[in-house]
Each structure stands twice: as structure tokens, then as C-alpha cells.
Amino acid sequence: MKGKEEKEGGARLGAGGGSPEKSPSAQELKEQGNRLFVGRKYPEAAACYGRAITRNPLVAVYYTNRALCYLKMQQHEQALADCRRALELDGQSVKAHFFLGQCQLEMESYDEAIANLQRAYSLAKEQRLNFGDDIPSALRIAKKKRWNSIEERRIHQESELHSYLSRLIAAERERELEECQRNHEGDEDDSHVRAQQACIEAKHDKYMADMDELFSQVDEKRKKRDIPDYLCGKISFELMREPCITPSGITYDRKDIEEHLQRVGHFDPVTRSPLTQEQLIPNLAMKEVIDAFISENGWVEDY
């Protein structure tokens, strides 16, 4: 057979055996995939990125692009594999860490998700890449879901403990009532027995009521263990300590926005409007709300 085997950037004969037709390069396939992605044709875009990978399997961005397609199609295992391959090729890839964190978030691997999202955020700052609120938003969601998961386990454990203690109290009640009945068998006057049984019933009713009240107090405190999003910084995702507002109307924690201005650039991270440190104004109303929240919720430091 004449001719050389087809290679990237090489040529192949047209259907009519005429002039050679240039086959698309890996970069051209990637660009075609980008156009399909913009059109929300995710399966077709993923296929294009796959062909680009076949052409050149050593470019991390091809894997992250395909991973995003898989994320859109909720094919998390495939997305996970592509992100990990991308990180093997480029350990400093912000998108690989970001998409990997999103995969792990969807798969409920919250600790791993938080670690990768935090890494993505740190790398974005180091490389002066602006992802707006995308990474911080995903990180806030991951932290909240991890907290909710921990709380659900606590609730389940408390429910099991409540049931166990209730059974113990009920069993002790029955045992004492039966013992009282045996001790007074044959008595002609059973008024004394009834009085003792009433005392036993009252005692164990109080045990049950006290236990229910204790669990109710714990439950009420647990219900309050949630930091509202509006009290969290847009950059650190943590409870703000020194809130300040920008001309765009966005409130940040001062130390975080000042660090952003010094290390990344003089613009608002969310709106991308020009911003300097002199334009930051203390948000005294928000500070008052935050201080009140902290004083009423001592658990905040461990959130």
C-alpha cells in the first residue's frame, strides 16, 4: 500500500482519490470541541477532546476540557479519571484541581473535595487567574455539605441513644412494678400497693421527661449551628471578622481583599471592576451583626 500512515498534521487522500486532505490537528480538534461545548453539545464536545487526546496525550488541558463535559453530563467517574490524568501532566493546573473538587463534591467525598478546591483557589491566586466567585462558591458548598453530613451522623447517634435510654427506663419501670406486685401478693388492702405503684410511675415519668428535655435542648442548639452565607467572606469562605464594602456593593473580609489587591491585582474579585485599597469602606452594620452572631454562638470557631 502506497503512502505513509496517517499522523497528526499529516495528510490523507480525499474520497475521490484526488488531492490530499489535511487531517485536523489536536489543537484544531480542541477548538472544535470548544465550539460544541459553547453550544451545550457536551457528548460531541467530549468526543472531540477525546480525539485531541488520541492525537496528543500529553496536553493537560484536553483532559480538563473533557472532564468538564463529563461533569455537565454527570459522569463523575470519567471526569475524576480525566482530572487525575491532567494533574499527572500538570500538577499546577487550577482547572484540574477545581473540576476534581467538583467531582468529589458530587460523589460526597467532602474532605477530598475541600482539599482540592482550596488547592485550586491557592493556585489561582499564585498564578493571578481570576475565576470570580466560582471556586469560592464551590468551596462554601463543600464545607456546608460536610458540616451537614457530620450533623446528620450526630442526629442519628443521638436518636439511637434516646431510643436506648427510653427502653432502659421503660424496662426498669416494669421491673419495679412487678417487684412491688410480688412483694404485696395476698395483701387484703391493696391501697398501699397502688400508692407505691403510682410513685414508681411518677418517678419514671419524670426520668423520661427530664431526658426528653435534655435531648430537646441539644437539638435546639444543633439547629442553630449554621453560619448564614451573608456573614461569610467571598474570598476566604469563613465568617468575616473585619467586613468592608467596595464601590460595587460587595462586602469582603478586609485581610482577604487587601491580600487579593496586593497579590492578584487591583480589581474587585467578583465584579472585576477596578478597585484600590483606599476605596474599601468599613461595613459597620455588618460588623455589628457578626459580633452579635458570635456572642450567641460559641461553636462558631469550630465550624
From Swiss-Prot:
GO terms for cellular component: cytoplasm; cytosol; endoplasmic reticulum; mitochondrion; nuclear inclusion body; nucleoplasm; nucleus; protein folding chaperone complex. Residues 142-196 are annotated as: Required for interaction with and ubiquitination of MYOCD. It catalyses: S-ubiquitinyl-[E2 ubiquitin-conjugating enzyme]-L-cysteine + [acceptor protein]-L-lysine = [E2 ubiquitin-conjugating enzyme]-L-cysteine + N(6)-ubiquitinyl-[acceptor protein]-L-lysine. Changing residue 269 to A: Abolishes E3 ligase activity. Monoubiquitinated at Lys-2 following cell stress by UBE2W, promoting the interaction with ATXN3. Auto-ubiquitinated; mediated by UBE2D1 and UBE2D2 and enhanced in the presence of MAP2K5. Its EC number is 2.3.2.27. Changing residue 65 to S: In SCAR16; reduces protein level; reduces ubiquitin ligase activity; does not change autoubiquitination. Expressed in differentiated myotubes (at protein level). Highly expressed in skeletal muscle, heart, pancreas, brain and placenta. Detected in kidney, liver and lung. Residues 1-10 have a biased composition (Basic and acidic residues). One of its GO terms (molecular function) is Hsp70 protein binding. Induction: Up-regulated by inflammatory signals in regulatory T-cells (Treg). Pathway: Protein modification; protein ubiquitination. Residues 226-300 form the U-box domain. Residues 143-303 are annotated as: Required for ubiquitination of FOXO1. There is a cross-link at residues 2, 22, 221, 255 (Glycyl lysine isopeptide (Lys-Gly) (interchain with G-Cter in ubiquitin)). Keywords: Cytoplasm, Disease variant, DNA damage, DNA repair, Isopeptide bond, Mitochondrion, Neurodegeneration, Nucleus, Phosphoprotein, Repeat, Spinocerebellar ataxia, TPR repeat, Transferase, Ubl conjugation, Ubl conjugation pathway. Residues 101-200 are annotated as: Required for interaction with MAPK7. E3 ubiquitin-protein ligase which targets misfolded chaperone substrates towards proteasomal degradation. Plays a role in the maintenance of mitochondrial morphology and promotes mitophagic removal of dysfunctional mitochondria; thereby acts as a protector against apoptosis in response to cellular stress. Negatively regulates vascular smooth muscle contraction, via degradation of the transcriptional activator MYOCD and subsequent loss of transcription of genes involved in vascular smooth muscle contraction. It is linked to Spinocerebellar ataxia, autosomal recessive, 16: A form of spinocerebellar ataxia, a clinically and genetically heterogeneous group of cerebellar disorders. Patients show progressive incoordination of gait and often poor coordination of hands, speech and eye movements, due to degeneration of the cerebellum with variable involvement of the brainstem and spinal cord. SCAR16 is characterized by truncal and limb ataxia resulting in gait instability. Additionally, patients may show dysarthria, nystagmus, spasticity of the lower limbs, and mild peripheral sensory neuropathy. Spinocerebellar ataxia 48: A form of spinocerebellar ataxia, a clinically and genetically heterogeneous group of cerebellar disorders. Patients show progressive incoordination of gait and often poor coordination of hands, speech and eye movements, due to degeneration of the cerebellum with variable involvement of the brainstem and spinal cord. SCA48 is an autosomal dominant neurodegenerative disease characterized by onset in mid-adulthood of progressive cognitive decline and gait ataxia, and vermian and hemispheric cerebellar atrophy. The U-box domain is required for the ubiquitin protein ligase activity. Antibodies against STUB1 are found in patients with chronic lymphocytic leukemia (CLL) and in colorectal cancer patients. This is E3 ubiquitin-protein ligase CHIP. The gene is STUB1.
